[in-house]
């Protein structure tokens, strides 16, 4: 039944159509609430989700033909960086598989001073793409940092990889 009587509780099931998703990874959305057919402006449900691919139904043959994400070096040490300096470094991502590799998303976890960019979301077999990480040290304290960056692709064997960036902020 769609009707709750006074003092009753109910369960609301929410289904998300991933086929219509425009982004991958963590996201937040709102659902409008209607009571007796009228929208209640001050009532919205906040939904948090992490959109990831489900590889569980892939056959062995599909897995053998899948892309393979290889990061040439997943750890970069930038050494000492002067406070206020902007620095760019590059992680190289290669598709060692048999079908196109897609970057689903990259999360630096620190968008206020660390941003990621890349020239192509689709990487053909045997090709590579540079993942550029830009560091803005303007508001950072003078300490040593070890920052983790999450890389998510359509590689069914290892869809999520972590890149590490080491640096020290000095005067």
Predicted regions: what they are:
Residues 15, 32-34, 48, 92-94, ...:
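Residue-level recognition of well-ordered beta-strand positions that form the cores
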Residues 5-9, 22-26, 40, 82, ...:
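Surface-exposed coil/turn segments at beta-strand junctions on protein surfaces, enriched
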Residues 12-20, 131-139:
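Short, hydrophobic beta-strand segments
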Residues 1-11, 98-127:
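Surface-exposed binding patches on compact interaction domains or structured appendages
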Residues 36-92, 96-98, 156-171:
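Long, low-complexity ectodomains and other extracytoplasmic segments of secretory-pathway proteins
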Residues 19-32, 42-44, 83-90, 138-150:
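Short, solvent-exposed loop/turn segments enriched in Ser/Thr/Gly
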Residues 2-4, 18-19, 78-79, 118-123, ...:
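Beta-strand-rich interaction surfaces with strong enrichment in secreted/lumenal proteins
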């Amino acid at each position: 039944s769609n009707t709750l009587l006074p003092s009753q509780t109910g369960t609301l099931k929410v289904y998300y159509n991933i086929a219509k998703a425009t982004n991958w990874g963590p996201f937040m959305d709102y659902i409008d609430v209607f009571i007796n057919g009228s929208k209640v402006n001050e009532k919205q449900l906040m939904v948090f989700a992490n959109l990831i691919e489900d590889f569980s139904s892939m056959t062995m043959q599909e897995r053998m033909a899948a892309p393979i994400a290889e990061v040439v070096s997943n750890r970069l040490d930038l050494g000492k960086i002067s406070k206020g300096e902007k620095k760019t470094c590059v992680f190289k991502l290669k598709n060692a598989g048999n079908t196109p590799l897609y970057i689903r998303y990259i999360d630096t976890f620190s968008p206020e001073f660390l941003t990621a960019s890349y020239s192509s979301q689709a990487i053909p077999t045997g090709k590579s793409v540079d993942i550029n990480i830009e560091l803005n040290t303007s508001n950072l304290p003078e300490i040593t940092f070890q920052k983790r960056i999450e890389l998510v692709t359509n590689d069914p064997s290892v869809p999520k990889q972590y890149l590490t960036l080491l640096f020290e902020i000095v005067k």
